[in-house]
Swiss-Prot record:
GO terms for cellular component: cytosol. It holds the Pfam family Bac_DNA_binding. Heterodimer of an alpha and a beta chain. One of its GO terms (molecular function) is DNA binding. This protein is one of the two subunits of integration host factor, a specific DNA-binding protein that functions in genetic recombination as well as in transcriptional and translational control. GO terms for biological process: DNA recombination; positive regulation of metabolic process; regulation of DNA-templated transcription; regulation of translation. PROSITE patterns: HISTONE_LIKE (PS00045). It comes from Paramagnetospirillum magneticum (strain ATCC 700264 / AMB-1) (Magnetospirillum magneticum). Belongs to the bacterial histone-like protein family. Keywords: DNA recombination, DNA-binding, Transcription, Transcription regulation, Translation regulation. This is Integration host factor subunit alpha. InterPro entries: Hist_DNA-bd, Histone-like_DNA-bd_CS, IHF-like_DNA-bd_dom_sf, IHF_alpha.
Length: 106
């Protein structure tokens, strides 16, 4: 596994290189896409990106947890969590990339 993290600036630069928009336009395009995705998720809508995966928001109910230091029971409040499900194509791409790094051995 790699420790490399791709940042917004790097994504914006990749859009600039690939699409040929100006750097400012590339950054604006990336921000618009991310704003649209996050806005839809905030409303509770699912976001499906073909050949990539789907994002959805799931509600988790209240439950009882335990403080690991004291063993005391603690209520955990209900909340919404973000869920990402990769597409089969993305899973295959990732697994093929891992196999190539290991020299083709599975």
């Amino acid at each position: 596994m790699t420790d490399k993290t791709i940042t917004r600036a790097q994504l914006s630069e990749a859009v600039y290189q690939e699409v040929g928009l100006s750097r400012n336009e590339s950054a604006d395009l990336l921000e618009a896409v991310l704003d649209e995705i996050s806005g839809a998720l905030a409303k509770g809508d699912a976001v499906k990106i073909s050949s990539f995966g789907s994002f959805s928001v799931r509600s988790k109910g209240q439950r009882i947890g335990r403080n690991p230091k004291t063993g005391e029971e603690v209520p955990i409040t209900p909340r919404r969590v973000l869920v990402f499900r990769p597409s089969q194509l993305l899973k295959k791409k990732i697994n093929d990339g891992m196999a190539a790094k290991r020299g083709g051995a599975k």
